[in-house]
């Protein structure tokens, strides 16, 4: 019997285009629609030996893994995944592997949102196409404005470099950030999270999700921001209190927000984030680029080959 491989959340239908799966002695079955319910997942994946999953969209708790008797290998894009129960996988003889992931696409996505907000691109384009007013917004200048970064890691530091190229004043804060590290990137270390929020014209989130960062930006923090300031989150949804952000947008306490990550993905129809005012929202596109997908799926093929040869690579955790 040939092995079967499920490729989850292949929304664009490109998984089999960007990598050569033909060299595998495996039947590859892409799933175009997201499966949220655990019972539905158990039913859909019950006769698969291998599952390829994107990011952290589909949790694999022990309760699901135990219901997949044929499952032997999970390949997750990226080298960090907090929604897979590794102990349960080990107990059931399931190997878990990851892939490389480029920091370039999320940096570019961050700037797409910042520029879109600053120049009212979506609003002006929609007005032009729909016969609306000719020029209805007044763009926010980037040159001379302050960009505040929550997090100065691999992605945050590259976002900072672009901000500096635009002539922005760039500040950064995280609990572990030192003045020396900030200076090495060419940015200022903010005195505190509160100071960064209060004095920045654009605030962009670039932190890993953990217990200390979960809910880091809530109603009190949003209240510190200028009414002319914008918040951008391309990192992890749970870092920003979504309800508090919705309230801030509705109350006009901030000028707007750019959001690429959500508490529930894909967003259900009728979800308030789909219709919030002054929100530039995108369906988690930060990692979605042809180059990144070629890496994800190309290395997924390599991982499957290595596993079948008895020498797994890029094992997690």
Each predicted region: which residue ranges?
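Phosphate-binding beta-alpha-beta segment of Rossmann-like dinucleotide-binding domains, i.e.
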Residues: 92-94, 98-146, 150, 161, ...
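Short, conserved active-site loop motifs that form the nucleotide-linked donor/cofactor pocket
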Residues: 26, 94, 187-188, 278-279
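Redox-cofactor binding/interface segments in oxidoreductases and associated redox assembly factors
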Residues: 50-53, 76, 204-205, 233, ...
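Glycine-rich Rossmann-fold phosphate-binding loop(s) that bind the pyrophosphate
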Residues: 10, 152-153
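Rossmann-like adenosine-cofactor binding region
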Residues: 43-46, 56-64, 176-272
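An N-terminal-biased, well-structured beta-alpha scaffold segment characteristic
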Residues: 1-97, 218, 224
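Rossmann-like dinucleotide-binding domain for NAD(H)/NADP(H)
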Residues: 96, 228-317
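N-terminal Rossmann-fold NAD(P) dinucleotide-binding loop
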Residues: 156-157
């Amino acid at each position: 019997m040939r092995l079967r491989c499920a490729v989850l959340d292949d929304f664009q239908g490109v998984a089999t285009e960007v990598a050569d799966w033909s060299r595998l002695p495996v039947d590859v079955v892409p799933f175009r629609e997201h499966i949220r319910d655990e019972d539905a997942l158990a039913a859909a994946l019950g006769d698969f030996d291998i599952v390829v999953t994107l990011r952290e969209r589909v949790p694999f708790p022990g309760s699901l893994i135990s219901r997949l008797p044929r499952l032997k290998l999970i390949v997750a894009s990226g080298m960090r995944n907090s929604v897979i129960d590794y102990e349960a996988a080990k107990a059931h003889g399931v190997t878990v592997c990851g892939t490389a992931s480029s920091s370039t696409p999320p940096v570019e996505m961050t700037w797409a949102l910042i520029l879109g907000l600053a120049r009212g691109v979506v609003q002006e384009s929609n007005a032009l196409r729909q016969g609306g007013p000719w020029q209805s917004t007044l763009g926010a200048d980037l040159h001379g404005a302050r960009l505040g970064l929550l997090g100065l890691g691999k992605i945050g530091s590259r976002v900072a470099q672009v901000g500096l190229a635009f002539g922005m004043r760039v500040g950064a804060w995280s609990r572990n950030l030192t003045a020396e590290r900030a200076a090495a990137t060419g940015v200022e270390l903010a005195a505190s999270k509160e100071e960064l929020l209060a004095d920045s014209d654009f605030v962009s989130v670039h932190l890993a999700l953990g217990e200390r960062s979960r809910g880091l930006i809530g109603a009190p923090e949003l209240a510190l921001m200028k009414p002319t300031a914008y918040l951008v989150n391309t990192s992890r949804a749970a870092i920003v209190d979504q309800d508090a952000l919705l309230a801030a947008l509705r109350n006009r306490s901030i000028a707007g927000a750019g959001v690429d990550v959500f508490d529930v993905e894909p967003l259900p129809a009728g979800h308030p984030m789909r219709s919030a005012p002054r929100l530039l929202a995108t369906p988690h596109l930060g990692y979605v680029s042809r180059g990144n997908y070629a890496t994800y799926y190309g290395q997924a093929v390599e991982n499957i080959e290595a596993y079948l040869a008895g020498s797994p690579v890029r094992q997690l955790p």
